[in-house]
Amino acid sequence: MGIAKEFREFAVKGNVIDLAVGVIIGGAFGKIVDSVVSDLIMPVVGLVFGKLDFSNLFIVLGSVPEGTPYTLEAIRKAGVPVLAYGNFITVAVNFVILAFIIFVMVKQINRLKRETPVEPPAPPATPEDIQLLREIRDSLKR
């Protein structure tokens, strides 16, 4: 039972739970970024460059069997090696956007941390005997 108890203590620690929440949110956030890239950004980029679908951009590195449709999926099913650079472009744009969003978030968090001023601790109260000595000194000066 010692191992089970140790594991429970380990799993309930704040860092492990924070990590689990981060992974779950990161997975969901990754899906949002994928959707933004594939549904919003890549169609605009494709429109600008004259191609609407980057996923079908590829270079065939072998011979294509007769009767095989000239699509990436069909050529891959036929076992022909291909260089699928269109998919790479989509994934690279996805990565750049995700990295930029994370950069902006970290920058904002750091800014908020800097803006929160740390108040210096209040000086300790002057002991009563010192206070009395100061009052005596001040009265003698007059």
Curated annotation (Swiss-Prot):
<dbReference type="InterPro" id="IPR037673">
    <property type="entry name" value="MSC/AndL"/>
</dbReference>
<protein>
    <recommendedName>
        <fullName>Large-conductance mechanosensitive channel</fullName>
    </recommendedName>
</protein>
<dbReference type="GO" id="GO:0005886">
    <property type="term" value="C:plasma membrane"/>
</dbReference>
<dbReference type="InterPro" id="IPR001185">
    <property type="entry name" value="MS_channel"/>
</dbReference>
<keyword id="KW-0407">Ion channel</keyword>
<keyword id="KW-0813">Transport</keyword>
<keyword id="KW-0812">Transmembrane</keyword>
<feature type="transmembrane region" description="Helical">
    <location>
        <begin position="86"/>
        <end position="106"/>
    </location>
</feature>
<keyword id="KW-1003">Cell membrane</keyword>
<comment type="subunit">
    <text>Homopentamer.</text>
</comment>
<keyword id="KW-1133">Transmembrane helix</keyword>
<keyword id="KW-0997">Cell inner membrane</keyword>
<dbReference type="InterPro" id="IPR019823">
    <property type="entry name" value="Mechanosensitive_channel_CS"/>
</dbReference>
<feature type="transmembrane region" description="Helical">
    <location>
        <begin position="40"/>
        <end position="60"/>
    </location>
</feature>
<keyword id="KW-0472">Membrane</keyword>
<dbReference type="InterPro" id="IPR036019">
    <property type="entry name" value="MscL_channel"/>
</dbReference>
<dbReference type="Pfam" id="PF01741">
    <property type="entry name" value="MscL"/>
</dbReference>
<comment type="function">
    <text>Channel that opens in response to stretch forces in the membrane lipid bilayer. May participate in the regulation of osmotic pressure changes within the cell.</text>
</comment>
<feature type="transmembrane region" description="Helical">
    <location>
        <begin position="10"/>
        <end position="30"/>
    </location>
</feature>
<comment type="similarity">
    <text>Belongs to the MscL family.</text>
</comment>
<dbReference type="GO" id="GO:0008381">
    <property type="term" value="F:mechanosensitive monoatomic ion channel activity"/>
</dbReference>
<keyword id="KW-0406">Ion transport</keyword>
